[in-house]
Each structure stands twice: as structure tokens, then as C-alpha cells.
């Protein structure tokens, strides 16, 4: 059965960090976005194998992702 996971990529000093939204333990880094994608896919495969071996429930993908806009300079101080 095919599951789709949502990946988040963040630019870091050494390249890119990739992490799955639905499975935050699946995280990796690469020198560029392509390497990071490849390594994230490999990390996901390894995590699926580890979870199966430990008889743990594999998190399902398919999260709903949306951006939440905010004008940071318009936010006042809290009480």
C-alpha cells in the first residue's frame, strides 16, 4: 500500500535539513536539496524497517499542510 508523507526542507549552513511532518523522527541532512531528498527517502525506508521489526505502528502520511500568514511587526506585546 502506498503512503504519501509531507516533507519539510529547511536551508541550513551545511546545505538542507529534511524532516517528515507526520513522522518527525525521520530527519536528515544533505549538501543540496536533491541529496537531502534522497537521504530523507532512505531514512524513511530504514525507519519503516525498524518499526516493523519492533512491531510498532507506522505513522500514516497525508497531513493537511497550510501556511498561516502573519504581519510580525503588527503583533503587540502579551499581557
Predicted regions and their residues:
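Short glycine- and Lys/Arg-enriched binding-loop motifs that mark or flank ligand-binding interfaces
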Residues: 11-14, 26, 51
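Hydrophobic alpha-helix-in-membranes signature
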Residues: 21-23, 68
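Short aromatic-glycine-(Arg/Gly/Cys) micro-motifs in beta-strand/loop hairpins
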Residues: 8-21
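A short, exposed loop/beta-hairpin motif centered on an aromatic-Gly-Thr core
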Residues: 24-33
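Short, charged, surface-exposed hinge/linker loops at domain edges
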Residues: 1-5, 38-79
Amino acid at each position: 500500500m502506498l503512503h504519501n508523507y509531507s516533507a519539510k526542507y529547511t536551508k541550513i549552513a551545511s546545505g538542507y535539513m529534511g524532516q517528515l511532518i507526520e513522522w518527525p523522527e525521520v530527519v536528515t541532512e544533505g549538501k543540496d536539496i536533491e541529496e537531502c531528498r534522497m537521504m530523507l527517502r532512505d531514512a524513511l525506508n530504514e525507519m519503516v524497517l525498524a518499526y516493523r521489526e519492533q512491531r510498532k505502528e507506522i505513522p500514516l502520511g497525508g497531513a493537511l499542510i497550510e501556511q498561516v500568514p502573519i504581519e510580525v511587526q503588527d503583533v503587540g506585546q502579551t499581557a
